[in-house]
Design a protein with these regions (language model features):
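Short, low-complexity N-terminal leaders and the immediately following helix N-cap/first helix
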Residues: 1-80, 150
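Short, glycine/charged-enriched hinge/interface segments at domain edges or termini
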Residues: 2-15, 71-166
Length: 166
């Protein structure tokens, strides 16, 4: 075989390359296993590796809540096609529970972070509704569950919040 055939850019042959096993053995020889665990303050943890999972003690968010300012309603009240007119019966503020009951063809003005009133499964953002006195006109195409953050959506209680080895 000619020298140009052995050392061509079209060839995978490299006489100086390590085999996969040789490379793995070299990497293993350079590692120093961590033999101890220690508890450190969070401010001292930068650059450290977790020895075990950190488990979330509670859900984040703690409760279902509105992701947007808008109107909380029951998806079942929306027309299959076309717009729907609903009566606004109150306001749900963040940090407060709406005390009223939402009936058929009713909705509640809701702020970001507020708990959806009982029975309401959808939040329609304020930018797409048309306000007409104490009623709103909701356009077609709204999906059940839209704009509602579910309890535990970011972190679920009892599940790893941070994984070991990271």
């Amino acid at each position: 075989m000619s020298l140009t055939a052995r050392f061509s850019c079209l060839s995978d042959y490299d006489p100086d390359a390590l085999s996969v096993e040789q490379a793995r053995a070299f990497i293993r020889s350079q590692l120093t296993p961590v033999g101890t665990r220690e508890r450190v303050a969070l401010r001292s943890a930068l650059g450290r590796v977790l020895a075990s999972d950190v488990i979330a003690p509670f859900n984040v968010p703690a409760h279902d809540n509105s992701a947007m300012d808008g109107y909380a309603l029951r998806q079942a009240d929306l027309a299959g096609s076309g717009e729907t007119r609903l009566h606004v019966i109150g306001t749900a503020l963040a940090g407060k529970v709406f005390a009223g009951a939402v009936g058929t063809a009713e909705c509640v003005r809701i702020m970001t972070g507020a708990l959806p009133p009982a029975g309401c499964d959808t939040v329609v953002i304020q930018e797409v509704v048309e306000l007409d006195g104490d009623q709103v006109v909701v356009p077609a195409g709204q999906r059940a569950g839209q704009n509602i953050r579910l309890a535990g959506e970011d972190l679920a209680a009892g599940k790893p919040a941070l994984a070991a080895g990271r």
